[in-house]
Each structure stands twice: as structure tokens, then as C-alpha cells.
Swiss-Prot record:
HAMAP family: PxpA (MF_00691)
GO biological process, one term: carbohydrate metabolic process
Complex formation: Forms a complex composed of PxpA, PxpB and PxpC.
Annotated catalysed reactions: 5-oxo-L-proline + ATP + 2 H2O = L-glutamate + ADP + phosphate + H(+)
Enzyme Commission number: 3.5.2.9
Name of one Pfam family that matches: LamB_YcsF
SUPFAM superfamilies: Glycoside hydrolase/deacetylase (SSF88713)
Keyword ATP-binding: yes
Organism superkingdom: Archaea
GO molecular function: 5-oxoprolinase (ATP-hydrolyzing) activity; ATP binding
Name of protein: 5-oxoprolinase subunit A
Organism: Pyrococcus furiosus (strain ATCC 43587 / DSM 3638 / JCM 8422 / Vc1)
Amino acid sequence: MKVDLNSDLGESFGRYKLGLDDEVMKYITSANVACGWHAGDPLVMRKTVRLAKKNNVQVGAHPGYPDLMGFGRRYMKLTPEEARNYILYQIGALYAFVKAEGLELQHVKPHGALYNAMVKEEDLARAVIEGILDFDKRLIVVTLAGSRVVEIAREMGARVAQEGFADRAYNPDGTLVPRSRPGAVIEDKEEIAERVISMVKDGGIRAINGEWIELEVDTICVHGDNPKAVEITAYIRRRLEEEGVKVLPMGDFIK
């Protein structure tokens, strides 16, 4: 049994520091690095890639809407052409630093509102995946487990990693409960670890209303932008390994 642990990193910008990247990087296997549009800048991007290299963590691009003020969490209506080229542009920007450090790019995980919009809008999902495949057909597309995006990406010939969220509540339809709703974000490390183990070993999780939903997950997102992030991430990894789960980069087992 195998699973990848990923985290959204490199989200500082200029003098503004966000996240505990140096510490979280010790416990994950894949890093989603912001590409400068919702967060990150050239200095932060290179620093984050170097940090991943130091910790033997695989690097992926984390492109989002062009929305620094809103941190990429506000919806924007894009044409398919805009979406395809926005993604290609951001992957290319990060890849410059990846190549400079002698690494390979493993995956692409869209950020925030873009990630969520792809689940609802098939045309947007196709355009984003086209942008990813334009760059490199070997890149893994990371998307919400059980969503229509998984089917679309596979139909288009992409490698896909289905993602579960360690600290987020789920709706009965398998989508994430909006952050604005009570109970959307889970903070207790024991509960978080049990939910992760349930997803990985039992193939599902309890929705916010108590319903059982089936989820096939390849990678678990752990957040690195809250005070307990390091403790929770380390605990999740330890618990998984105690359960006999191998924690590996997604590129090692996604076909």
C-alpha cells in the first residue's frame, strides 16, 4: 500500500512570509510550488525548489488564477484559450528554476479557486489539462479524488493522481466543504490522522453529515500554512508508516 504526501509551498511574496516550508518539507514527498500568480516570486520559487532538492522531495507546479490580492481563492471566468495559456506560462516559469537546479518536474496541481472550478466546469478542466500536456505529456495531473476531472484527464491521456485532503471536511458528493462553513477545516491531529488512514486503507471517509463516501486516493494534501502544520504533518506520516503504508513520491507509482 502506497501514498504520497503533498503540500502547497513557496507561497511567500516579497517581504511577506507565509508558511513553514523549511519544516514541513522534511515530512512530505511532493511539493506544489506557487508559480507567481497567486503567490510566490522568482526568489521564493528558486529558494523553494532548492529546499525540495535538499530534502529529496519531488517538485510540482501549483498554478492559479492571476490574483495575488485574493491569493487565488476568488473565482475568475476564463476562456479555454486563456486557461490553457495561463497554465502553460506558469509551468514554464517554475520549470526554469527546476531545470537550473538539475531537477525534473513531477506534477501539476492547480490552486484554490481554479482547482475547485475545474471540478464544476468541464471546458475549464479540459483547457487546463491541455496546457499541462502542451508542456510535457509525462506530467501527473493532481485533482480531487472521485471527481469528473479524473475521468477527463485519463480520457485525454494524462497521468492522474487522485487527491484527498487531510484537514478538510467533505460534502456527501465528494466535494470539499467551503472554508466559510463551520467544521470545514479540521484541526485535531488525531482526527486528521484517522481520516487519512481511512482514506488510504479503507478507501473512503465520512462526509460532514456522517454519510460514507468512497474515495480512491494516491496523494494526501497536508497544509503548511497554519501553526500546527509541522506537528500534524509529522504525525500523519508516522501514523501511516505504523499502519504499514509506504509514503513515496507519486511519480514512483502513478502509471
